[in-house]
Amino acid sequence: MQDVPPKGAVVTDYDRRHMTQYMRLLDAAGEGASWQEAARIILGLDTQKEPERARLVHDTHLERARWLSSVGYRQLAAGHTN
């Protein structure tokens, strides 16, 4: 997993490969899980050894997940590929 997911208004192959993690991040956020717990369990990151990196990876992927769930899903539903 990259530290920062792709940006932009197009669903990428990277997004497709990490869809499960994106959905799990959304679920964790909705359930009130701490970012540390989500980063450790869902993303497999060591929040003790690399707290800044773990926070960056978590926050940027959660942001991308939110975009996918509010906008990007339309591309998936329409069958768009890049």
Locate each region found by the language model.
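Short, charged amphipathic recognition helices of the HTH superfamily
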Residues: 31-41
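Long, charge-rich, low-complexity intrinsically disordered regions
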Residues: 77-82
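Short, amphipathic alpha-helical "recognition" segments used to contact nucleic acids or chromatin
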Residues: 15-31
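Short helix/strand-capping connector loops at secondary-structure junctions
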Residues: 4, 40-53
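Short, Lys/Arg-enriched N-terminal segment that forms or immediately precedes the first helix
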Residues: 1-13
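Major-groove recognition helix of helix-turn-helix-like DNA-binding domains
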Residues: 24-25, 48-72
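Residue-level signal for alpha-helical context at structural boundaries
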Residues: 43, 56-57, 76
